[in-house]
């Protein structure tokens, strides 16, 4: 049995990013998606990248930092299709929980991920979401009890659509990286400068 599956959501088109595939853009000479995947610490039992757009290139980029890649042929239909693929993979591996991280978030501190995992183990909540500066961020952990709901998601909402129907533990963290994503060239430049 796998206790915890980490899923890097790395399938999207990234249409607001005008410099090629944002996941393959580099921060400190490393692809954005690789830096994000590295935020999963050793206590995440299995790390899976869900790829779609430019799947071969993204899959090759993350191959050294994930345990496997899963191709999402429906990636153009929104983030929920990748969440579904990740939740199905976690369920297939009999996981206790799944932790989702968008692939365009290269600055999440691994200690934050560790705290989220610990909070899940200490809590009865269905989901654990990190909070910095009174705003929710990523990654978000969902207990196995949520897998059926996750595989039923549609559109471009991701797992946050469940926050109204499940018990959510908001976990205060001192990590601005839970909000730092790369959607535009300006976002990338800001990360390079910071």
List the predicted regions and their residue ranges.
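A generic structural signal for short hydrophobic patches within well-formed alpha-helices
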Residues: 113, 146-150, 188
């Amino acid at each position: 049995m796998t206790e915890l599956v980490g899923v890097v959501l790395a399938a999207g088109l990234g249409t607001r990013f005008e410099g090629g595939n944002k996941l393959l853009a580099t921060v400190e000479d490393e692809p954005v998606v690789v830096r994000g995947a590295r935020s999963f610490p050793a206590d995440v039992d299995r790390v899976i990248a869900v790829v779609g757009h430019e799947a071969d290139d993204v899959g090759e980029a993350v191959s050294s930092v994930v345990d496997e890649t899963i191709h999402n042929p429906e990636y153009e239909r929104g983030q929920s299709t990748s969440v579904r693929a990740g939740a199905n993979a976690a369920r297939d591996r009999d996981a206790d929980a799944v932790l989702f991280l968008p692939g365009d978030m290269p600055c999440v501190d691994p200690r934050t991920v560790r705290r989220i995992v610990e909070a899940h183990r200490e809590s009865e909540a269905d989901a654990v979401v990190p909070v910095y500066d009174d705003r929710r961020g990523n990654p978000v952990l969902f207990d196995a009890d949520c897998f059926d709901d996750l595989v039923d998601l549609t559109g471009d909402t991701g797992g946050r659509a469940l926050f109204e129907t499940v018990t959510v533990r908001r976990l205060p963290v001192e990590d601005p990286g839970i909000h730092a994503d790369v959607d535009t060239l300006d976002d990338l430049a800001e990360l390079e400068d910071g």
